[in-house]
Amino acid sequence: MGLIDYRALLIDCDEVLVDRDSGVWSALQPLLDNAPRAPDRDVVMAGFEAVIGTLYPRFDELGFSGLLCFAHRHLAERLGIRTSWEEGMTFARSVPNWTLFEDAPGAMLYLRKFYRLLVYADRDLQDRGLLCERLGLEPDSLLSLTTHPLDDPQWLAEMDLDPGETLRVSRPPAKALSDGGLCLIRRDRAQHRQPCAADICISSMADLVAQHQLSLRR
């Protein structure tokens, strides 16, 4: 299918619309200031991804803030740094300060003219309203993977979503819906040297808009 043939976009929020990694790295600085030597950013972020992955099955129990608080604690242990639960909660409450990628608001404004837009974003209830406002979304357009898993046909049917007409916009190594399309955003130039492992590969949300405009002219 071509880009203009899809009816809905299912967009991952973090690292597609929101610069989560920069937000996490900035919020980790008070912890890293106590490290015996300055840790490498790639090592720290890989460690963060690892601990988040192990904690994610407890999302319903912990909530997003709790998940981040425990991740802060576990990451500190991996790095051999002493920390407190209070510091962990301060880190967890940094989420509203995570910035949008510069091209995200304009891209969302354009794309909503042509698609139904749904966004995957794990956030606590008190943070969801602000995120919807920043992205120009209705509250029911903000979904969580814990309640709306990609492999569950029930909620897709309830929301009148045909997987075959839905394009997932995510970052590597994401997968598409069962028979839907996949668009991978590769903001890192080093990723561009790799073959595109999706139906569409883009370098930014602005690039997705440009490709859509080009498709309309064909």
Features from the language model and the residues they span:
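Generic recognition of short, well-ordered alpha-helical segments
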Residues: S22-S26, E102-G106, L130, C196
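Catalytic-core regions built around general acid/base machinery
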Residues: L31, D103-F114
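A metal-dependent, Asp-based hydrolase signature
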Residues: G53-M89
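Active-site neighborhood of HAD-like aspartate-dependent phosphohydrolases
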Residues: M1-G47, R78
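Short alpha-helical scaffolding segments that buttress acidic/His motifs in well-ordered protein cores
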Residues: G47-F48, F91
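Asp-based, Mg2+/Mn2+-dependent phosphohydrolase catalytic module
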Residues: M1-R7, L109, Y120-R218
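Surface-exposed cleft-lining segments at the edges of enzyme active sites
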Residues: M89-W98
